[in-house]
Amino acid sequence: MQDHGSLPSVLDVHVNVAGRSSVLGKVKSRKARWSVRPSDMSNKTFNPIRAIVDNMKVKPNPNKTMIALSIGDPTVFGNLPTDPEVTQAMKDALDSGKFNGYVPSIGYLSSREEVASYYHCPEAPLEAKDVILTSGCSQAIELCLAVLANPGQNILVPRPGFSLYRTLAESMGIEVKLYNLLPEKNWEIDLKQLESLIDEKTVCLIVNNPSNPCGSVFSRRHLQKILAVAARQCVPILADEIYGDMVFSDSKFEPLATLSSKVPILSCGGLAKRWLVPGWRMGWILIHDRRDIFGNEIRDGLTKLSQRILGPCTLVQGALKSILCRTPRVFYHNTLSFLKSNADLCYGALAAIPGLRPIHPSGAMYLMVGIEMEHFPEFENDVEFTEQLVAEQSVHCLPATCFEYPNFFRVVITVPEVMMLEACSRIQEFCEQHYHCAEGSQEECDK
């Protein structure tokens, strides 16, 4: 046995090819040591909501039951169950034994056909080849960003807006540029400011309608103006429409793709919100590209990217046809009636509180409330305001700093009515205790 003694600092690397020995080169030896570090991607991943909420140092008032108006999960309180047809569809899929194996990463052809059929319309035709099934709408958004943007390029994101856009983009080395929504115009986009952000590295405009966190619903005319900017600047749109059709009776949801054939659009949706099953993780991407601007490259790219996790849950895919076709319209109506009633109740109660400026929502599951900070000088910002609200009243609302929009807070309107009433009463008590008249406005306070 050959005695190597101590290994040299470099090793000759030999390979035998067809009986001939050749030297490929010198390779430095690796010094064996433990050096396990997190990846750059993990270090760049940042969730504003978690960063703020997890660092809250206050505890709820032990004498008051906690009321969480912060969680965007409609199932939390048990008052908004999905329809029996939806659960029966899942039971049938499970009992059939047909949906237990691997499937194409973009989903069963039959399931994609059902989604295409459900959303097809003359203004925005769809076929199965235009549908990618995903593990929830969040993965749909991730795939869209991954296929459209390279590190160093930028995307346009609403402010206030869903924090996941930033979390996903920055983890991939994509720059986020924030365009403003205008509270005085029911959260319409500041189109002039939006267009000023576009440069040679801009590869995607995210439009979230109906909006989380605002609860706003864009009019047809405003959507057409957004599309005009995208067409003029040749920027594709990622339409986050997970709350599509979840609008109140005085508004109408217009799918963005129905209003333009010029702009290529990737529309993201899913079962989570409208069907009240966020834990089932079923989402989709609808590819609208009637001028073939995306071509095969973007479609192929989405397929390749979807192969990283081999598709969403097969059981839910097996249930999709029944879920989409059999869910009765009364289920959707009842859900929206409840949400509108809660929205009206919450808005009315908070609008009567000095120092607060709620903005009435038109859909989704949220409303935003402005804080007139000059009347609450004890608090530096919305984070301190909401922290103290938890400490004194055991009511938890998300500070809108989580959505890049300070001095507002978001209220979730899915809680049972009795809890909403109690929460609003506690918020009123809190504000009355901390409200101070601004200088020169004593007359207003005496009213």
Swiss-Prot record:
The main enzyme category here is transferase
Q: Tell me the cofactors it needs.
A: pyridoxal 5'-phosphate
Keywords recorded for this protein, A-Z: Aminotransferase, Phenylalanine catabolism, Phosphoprotein, Pyridoxal phosphate, Transferase, Tyrosine catabolism
| GO MF term set | amino acid binding; L-tyrosine-2-oxoglutarate transaminase activity; pyridoxal phosphate binding
Q: Which residues carry this modification: Phosphoserine?
A: 441
* Pfam families referenced in this protein's UniProt entry, alphabetically: Aminotran_1_2 (PF00155), TAT_ubiq (PF07706)
Which Gene Ontology biological process is one annotated for this entry? Answer: biosynthetic process
Chain positions found as N6-(pyridoxal phosphate)lysine = 273
Pathway annotation from the record: Amino-acid degradation; L-phenylalanine degradation; acetoacetate and fumarate from L-phenylalanine: step 2/6
Q: Reaction catalysed by this chain?
A: L-tyrosine + 2-oxoglutarate = 3-(4-hydroxyphenyl)pyruvate + L-glutamate
Q: Extract the CDD domains matched here.
A: AAT_like (cd00609)
EC no.? Answer: 2.6.1.5
This protein's GO CC annotations = mitochondrion
| Reported function | Transaminase involved in tyrosine breakdown. Converts tyrosine to p-hydroxyphenylpyruvate. Can catalyze the reverse reaction, using glutamic acid, with 2-oxoglutarate as cosubstrate (in vitro). Has much lower affinity and transaminase activity for phenylalanine.
Describe its assembly.
Answer: Homodimer.
Name the family the entry cites: Belongs to the class-I pyridoxal-phosphate-dependent aminotransferase family.
The protein's name in its UniProt record:
Tyrosine aminotransferase
- The species is Bos taurus (Bovine)
